[in-house]
């Protein structure tokens, strides 16, 4: 049986932090390496670090628009809130979801805009 990298990562993800720490120590001992990050010597301060692409987004409801009932239904579907909480959030505006992937944020935005809401993804 051949282990793929994906299977190995999945197996590690199921372990506790203590088990992962023991695994790292065993790998260090077995291969004679260290998990410590190497120290980089900077040639100049002008060398800019690469810009990291944003991976987590926040979806914010700015305005409900004219179709308030449709927006409340969409907010309930997206957030899992009860009717009163969804109505309050729709009327006041605010953060619907935090720390979501770009794909999920775009999906939520499309659903709410289709219902008539104004949505912002940050």
From Swiss-Prot:
Protein purpose: Forms part of the ribosomal stalk which helps the ribosome interact with GTP-bound translation factors. Is thus essential for accurate translation.
Taxonomy, superkingdom: Bacteria
PANTHER family xref list: 39S RIBOSOMAL PROTEIN L12, LARGE RIBOSOMAL SUBUNIT PROTEIN BL12M
GO biological process: translation
Gene3D superfamilies: 3.30.1390.10, Single helix bin (1.20.5.710)
Quaternary structure and interacting proteins, as annotated: Homodimer. Part of the ribosomal stalk of the 50S ribosomal subunit. Forms a multimeric L10(L12)X complex, where L10 forms an elongated spine to which 2 to 4 L12 dimers bind in a sequential fashion. Binds GTP-bound translation factors.
Keywords, comma-separated and alphabetical: Ribonucleoprotein, Ribosomal protein
Presence of the UniProt keyword Ion transport in the record: no
Membership in a protein family: Belongs to the bacterial ribosomal protein bL12 family.
GO cellular component: cytosolic large ribosomal subunit
Organism: Xylella fastidiosa (strain M12)
Gene Ontology MF term list: mRNA binding; structural constituent of ribosome
Protein name: Large ribosomal subunit protein bL12
Pfam families (UniProt xref): Ribosomal_L12, Ribosomal_L12_N
NADP in keyword set: no
Cysteine pairs bridged by disulfides in the record: none
């Amino acid at each position: 049986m051949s282990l793929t990298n994906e299977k190995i990562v999945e197996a590690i993800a199921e372990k506790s932090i203590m088990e992962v720490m023991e695994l790292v120590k065993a790998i260090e001992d077995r291969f004679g390496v260290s998990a410590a990050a190497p120290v980089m010597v900077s040639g100049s301060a002008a060398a800019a670090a690469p810009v990291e692409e944003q991976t987590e987004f926040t979806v914010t409801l700015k305005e409900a628009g004219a179709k308030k009932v449709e927006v409340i239904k969409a907010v309930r579907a997206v957030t899992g809130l009860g009717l009163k909480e969804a109505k309050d959030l729709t009327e006041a505006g605010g953060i619907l979801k935090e720390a979501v992937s770009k794909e999920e944020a775009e999906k939520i935005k499309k659903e709410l805009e289709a219902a008539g809401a104004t949505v912002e993804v940050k």
